[in-house]
Amino acid sequence: MARTLLTDDIWQQIQDTMRLHGCYCSKNSRNIMEAILWKLRTGATWRDIPQEFCPWQTAYNRFNRWASKGLWDKFFFRLRGVLDQEWVFIDGSYIRVHQHASGARNGSERAIGQSRGGRTTKIHLATDANGLPIDFKITGGDVHDSQVAEQLIETVEAADYLIADKGYDAEPIRIFIKNKNMIPIIPMRSNSKRLNKEFDKYLYRLRHLVENAFARLKHFRAIATRFDKLARNYQSMIYIACMFIWCKAK
């Protein structure tokens, strides 16, 4: 028998959220959700989903239909708990793209780039003071962290401090953070001649929390390696993983 992930408590949270968004909950809705989580956890193909959950077509059709309607991200934001925003973190992480993710007809919908490690996607993640996901953006792996910084910072509604690594060391980014009434905790590059009065070594050491968040996301093999052709579907997989992390944390 296939291992399941949904406890009664987690399923109740998800089911209530589905109903709030007008989604019909049939008697096999829990099994369909288990099938989608099984795919997320194992990274296997949709056709390999155990029949004991439901036919693989049923699981795929529901996942794809809700992804196209933008429902998975709505579920995440509804299930996301109270954020601890005394300080927040932003960072990026490369994801290797499997050959099965190639071939999407519209290149603009792929978020796949060619970098030194081959074909990659990059997840740009913002987390709260507990290392729990606030939101994220995905781009091709050839996109530098600083290029997505402002979009990512916009997802952080309020915080006292924003902590990031040297990849975000740029004066326009620091100004943008300060304009949001946050203090940037970002180390200077080695060749920088500017003063860094705001830098706090203690707070910067806490940056492992965002790295831990990436580690939790990559426990799901469909996140650790990208198998989805469309950026929309891969993004939805990440939202489901973030949703599950929050449900477990409550």
Q: What name fits each language-model region?
A:
Residues M1-K250:
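Short alpha-helical elements
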